[in-house]
Amino acid sequence: MFWRLGCAATVLLWSASAAPADSINIDGVTRTFTVKLPKARPAPLVVVLHGNTQTGEDMISRTSWPQLARRENIGLVFPDGLNRAWADLRSNSKRALRTPPAGTDDVGFIARLVEKFVGDGSADPKRIYVTGVSNGGAMTMTMVCERADLFAAAASVIINLTDEFAAACHPSRPVPILMMNGTADPLVPYRGGRGSSRFAADGFWSTEKTLDFWRHVNGCDGQDSASVDLADSDHDDTTTVTRIESRCPRGGDVVLYRINDGGHRMPGSFSDARFPRAVDFMLGPQNHDIDGAEVIWGFFRRFP
């Protein structure tokens, strides 16, 4: 569930330069984050959550969110997980690699950030969104489960639910949600179970079962309403994209972007790796037909 797998992958992926982070105190614990706000306020605000072993700065340097935000005049906040991990609805024994300290309240941390920027007039309370990759995708789903009242829409990337996670998830209301998963992911297998990587955790649901869960939560029909193969604009990346839509009540949209033959990486208009072939070997290919941030923002901007 992680873009950086130990020291070797840290060298192979683009390394994030250190950036000054803001901080906030949560129950006596100093939590850090990086925020980028436009001059025109209140603005839409997207909470962007990093993967395991990462920090918010990785999402700034490895995705197109900053460029998109400047163009669209939206705010971004990049929180940092303690020990570079998030306390999602799974127990620590069900995770791989890093785990957050016992008792970490990441739901409270992220909610406090949203309340802070809404409270000071920086963010429009009707246009708050949350997205994340891998462990950050699991934390995104956790925020929908625990604080659906805060968000107009959500998007999870390269993550599936587990039995434990789903049993603890009881959203207070439907939240439009977009999923983006690769069929050749070695860490979070598309068909569920345990991934082929030695770093993988076990017990994942399949992407189809995870999709059905959110369809049920949002009151959607159980069958696909449309399946569209998107243009294969980059023939060299060995992957393609299929958009799968659902028939849902208004305001409860559920959409899956299936990255055919895609790995444990967010699609992007530029590479997330310094040595792409080596990272392709460890994590699978990165799709370049779509840009993950652009697709997610295109979904978000429809809500409310």
Q: PLM features: residue spans?
A:
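Primarily recognizes the serine-hydrolase "nucleophile elbow" in alpha/beta-hydrolase
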Residues: 61-64, 118-120, 125-175, 186
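Serine-hydrolase catalytic machinery in alpha/beta-hydrolase-like enzymes
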Residues: 22-129, 139-142, 146, 191, ...
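Bacterial N-terminal signal peptides that target proteins for export
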Residues: 1-7
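Alpha/beta-hydrolase fold active-site loops
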Residues: 44-46, 175-176, 254
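Catalytic active-site module of serine/aspartate enzymes centered on a nucleophile-bearing elbow/loop
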Residues: 277-304
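The feature captures the conserved acid-bearing segment of alpha/beta-hydrolase catalytic domains
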Residues: 152-235, 245-250, 261
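Solvent-exposed loop/turn segments at secondary-structure junctions
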Residues: 51-55, 81-86, 134-138, 160-163, ...
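Hydrophobic h-region of N-terminal signal peptides that target proteins for export
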Residues: 10-19
